UniProtKB/Swiss-Prot annotation:
Bilayer topology annotation: Multi-pass membrane protein
Domain of life, per lineage: Bacteria
GO cellular component, one term: plasma membrane
Protein's name according to its UniProt entry: Protein-methionine-sulfoxide reductase heme-binding subunit MsrQ
InterPro entries according to UniProt: Fe3_Rdtase_TM_dom, MsrQ-like
One GO process term, biological-process aspect: protein repair
Family membership noted in the UniProt record: Belongs to the MsrQ family.
Subunit structure: Heterodimer of a catalytic subunit (MsrP) and a heme-binding subunit (MsrQ).
Organism: Klebsiella pneumoniae subsp. pneumoniae (strain ATCC 700721 / MGH 78578)
Transmembrane portions of the chain: 8-28, 82-102, 116-136, 149-169, 171-191
Length: 202
């Protein structure tokens, strides 16, 4: 049985809750003192993982819609992508304000240049920003064929973001490895699309 338009609307509501409620929990956990001795790191990793989860969910939509024969499922892809950008922005903001401090914002540029994992993270965020800004139907019409080429840069984010996570942790734990493997699996699943995009930008 295929999804109806009404069911997709309810699915969007659930996905919005999945994006918003963790933010509520984050504020509540901070207020209750549930974080470790280094709450700044906890918040950075939490927001980063949320961005990765929505990134992986975004990449999953197209192949899932195709193989499950659920064409209307494509309608949730933009929503997932915007939540990915929102959490990535919170991730960047938490690093800037909690790690560097509001009085040291000028250091952000040099930090990005001198720390490779931050370089990858910033490139990923910049791509997500471009995708979010151009995600509307009006921008899709305006950009024409270039729109799809631009939005296929999500594949690059799927490569860089897990590496950023792996490099950012001092001790390699299973969690960043799992995210990297999931991203690799999704890129493999979408190998033909990924190869077409790679050839187009070379």
């Amino acid at each position: 049985m295929r999804f109806t338009v009404k069911q997709i609307v309810w699915l969007k509501v659930l996905l919005h809750l999945a994006g918003f409620l963790p933010l509520v929990w984050l504020f509540w956990a901070g207020h209750q003192g549930y974080f470790s001795a280094d709450p700044a790191k906890d918040i950075q990793h939490f927001t980063g993982r949320m961005a990765l989860k929505f990134l992986l969910a975004t990449l999953l939509v197209s192949p899932l819609a195709r193989y499950a024969k659920q064409p209307l499922l494509i309608r949730v892809r933009r929503l997932l992508g915007l939540w990915c950008f929102a959490w990535a922005t919170l991730h960047l903001t938490s690093y800037t304000l909690l790690e560097l401090g509001i009085n040291n914002l000028a250091l952000l540029g040099s930090e990005i240049i001198t720390r490779p994992y931050l370089t990858l993270g910033m490139i990923s965020w910049a791509i997500l920003l471009a995708l979010a800004v151009t995600s509307t139907q009006a921008m899709q019409r305006k950009l024409g064929r270039r729109w799809q080429l631009l939005h296929n840069f999500v594949y690059l984010v799927a490569i860089l973001a897990p590496i950023h996570y792996l490099w950012s942790v001092k001790i390699v734990s299973p969690q960043p490895v799992v995210y990297a493997l999931l991203a690799a699996g999704l890129l493999t699943w979408r190998y033909k699309k990924f190869r077409q995009w790679w050839r187009a930008i070379r």
